[in-house]
Protein backbone atom coordinates (compact mmCIF):
# COMPACT_ATOMS: atom_id res chain seq x y z
CA UNK A 1 0.00 0.00 0.00
CA UNK A 2 1.16 3.54 -0.62
CA UNK A 3 2.21 5.73 2.29
CA UNK A 4 -0.60 7.65 3.94
CA UNK A 5 -0.68 11.45 3.81
CA UNK A 6 -2.33 11.54 7.26
CA UNK A 7 -0.80 14.04 9.65
CA UNK A 8 -2.01 12.28 12.81
CA UNK A 9 -2.63 8.71 13.88
CA UNK A 10 -6.33 9.56 14.27
CA UNK A 11 -6.43 10.57 10.59
CA UNK A 12 -4.49 7.43 9.63
CA UNK A 13 -7.01 5.19 11.38
CA UNK A 14 -9.97 7.06 9.87
CA UNK A 15 -8.50 6.76 6.35
CA UNK A 16 -7.65 3.06 6.77
CA UNK A 17 -9.95 0.43 5.26
CA UNK A 18 -12.86 -0.41 7.56
CA UNK A 19 -11.58 -3.95 8.13
CA UNK A 20 -8.23 -2.62 9.44
CA UNK A 21 -9.53 -0.01 11.88
CA UNK A 22 -10.38 -2.25 14.84
CA UNK A 23 -6.97 -3.95 14.67
CA UNK A 24 -5.20 -0.58 14.40
CA UNK A 25 -7.10 0.77 17.39
CA UNK A 26 -6.38 -2.33 19.44
CA UNK A 27 -2.64 -2.14 18.71
CA UNK A 28 -2.70 1.55 19.55
CA UNK A 29 -4.51 0.86 22.82
CA UNK A 30 -2.10 -1.91 23.83
CA UNK A 31 0.94 0.30 23.21
CA UNK A 32 -0.54 3.24 25.13
CA UNK A 33 -1.58 1.05 28.07
CA UNK A 34 1.81 -0.68 28.20
CA UNK A 35 3.73 2.61 28.12
CA UNK A 36 1.44 5.46 29.24
CA UNK A 37 4.02 8.17 28.41
CA UNK A 38 4.57 6.94 24.85
CA UNK A 39 4.83 9.56 22.10
CA UNK A 40 2.57 8.73 19.16
CA UNK A 41 3.66 10.24 15.85
CA UNK A 42 3.43 9.80 12.09
CA UNK A 43 6.48 9.19 9.94
CA UNK A 44 6.98 7.78 6.45
CA UNK A 45 3.20 7.57 6.14
CA UNK A 46 2.62 5.31 9.15
CA UNK A 47 2.20 5.46 12.93
CA UNK A 48 5.28 5.23 15.15
CA UNK A 49 5.59 5.06 18.90
CA UNK A 50 8.53 6.53 20.79
CA UNK A 51 9.61 6.40 24.42
CA UNK A 52 13.18 7.55 25.07
CA UNK A 53 13.75 6.60 21.43
CA UNK A 54 12.00 4.56 18.75
CA UNK A 55 9.92 1.61 19.95
CA UNK A 56 7.49 0.34 17.34
CA UNK A 57 5.71 1.22 14.12
CA UNK A 58 2.69 -0.08 12.24
CA UNK A 59 2.51 -0.50 8.47
CA UNK A 60 -0.82 -0.96 6.67
CA UNK A 61 -0.92 -3.51 3.87
CA UNK A 62 -3.83 -4.76 1.76
CA UNK A 63 -4.78 -7.68 4.02
CA UNK A 64 -2.71 -7.23 7.16
CA UNK A 65 -0.77 -4.88 9.40
CA UNK A 66 2.96 -5.14 9.94
CA UNK A 67 4.10 -4.45 13.49
CA UNK A 68 7.77 -3.48 13.63
CA UNK A 69 9.78 -3.72 16.83
CA UNK A 70 12.70 -1.31 16.73
CA UNK A 71 15.32 -3.59 18.31
CA UNK A 72 13.94 -6.75 16.75
CA UNK A 73 12.03 -9.79 17.93
CA UNK A 74 13.72 -12.23 20.31
CA UNK A 75 13.68 -15.80 18.96
CA UNK A 76 11.35 -17.05 21.70
CA UNK A 77 8.81 -14.32 20.93
CA UNK A 78 9.04 -15.07 17.20
CA UNK A 79 8.30 -18.73 17.91
CA UNK A 80 5.35 -17.78 20.10
CA UNK A 81 3.96 -15.48 17.40
CA UNK A 82 4.39 -18.17 14.75
CA UNK A 83 2.59 -20.68 16.98
CA UNK A 84 -0.31 -18.20 17.07
CA UNK A 85 -0.36 -18.10 13.25
CA UNK A 86 1.51 -14.83 12.66
CA UNK A 87 4.23 -14.53 10.03
CA UNK A 88 7.41 -13.05 11.46
CA UNK A 89 10.65 -11.46 10.38
CA UNK A 90 13.69 -10.52 12.42
CA UNK A 91 12.09 -7.22 13.47
CA UNK A 92 8.41 -7.55 12.62
CA UNK A 93 5.28 -9.64 12.55
CA UNK A 94 2.01 -9.60 10.65
CA UNK A 95 -1.51 -9.38 11.99
CA UNK A 96 -4.15 -10.17 9.39
CA UNK A 97 -7.35 -8.20 9.77
CA UNK A 98 -9.22 -11.37 10.80
CA UNK A 99 -6.58 -12.47 13.36
CA UNK A 100 -6.62 -11.73 17.06
CA UNK A 101 -4.07 -9.20 18.24
CA UNK A 102 -1.62 -11.04 20.55
CA UNK A 103 -2.28 -8.58 23.38
CA UNK A 104 -0.16 -10.18 26.12
CA UNK A 105 2.80 -10.74 23.82
CA UNK A 106 2.59 -7.27 22.26
CA UNK A 107 2.40 -5.75 25.74
CA UNK A 108 5.50 -7.67 26.80
CA UNK A 109 7.41 -6.66 23.65
CA UNK A 110 6.52 -2.98 23.98
CA UNK A 111 7.39 -2.87 27.69
CA UNK A 112 10.73 -4.60 27.02
CA UNK A 113 11.58 -2.10 24.27
CA UNK A 114 10.61 0.83 26.51
CA UNK A 115 12.85 -0.51 29.27
CA UNK A 116 15.77 -0.95 26.83
CA UNK A 117 15.29 2.60 25.58
CA UNK A 118 15.12 4.00 29.10
CA UNK A 119 18.34 2.19 30.08
CA UNK A 120 20.09 3.56 26.98
CA UNK A 121 19.17 7.10 28.04
CA UNK A 122 20.44 6.61 31.62
Task: Write out the residue ranges for each language-model feature.
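Charge-dense, helix-prone N-terminal extensions
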Residues: 1-122
Amino acid sequence: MKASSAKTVDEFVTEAPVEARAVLEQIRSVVKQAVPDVDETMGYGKPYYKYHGWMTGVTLYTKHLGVEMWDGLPDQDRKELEALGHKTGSKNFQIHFDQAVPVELLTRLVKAQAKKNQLKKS
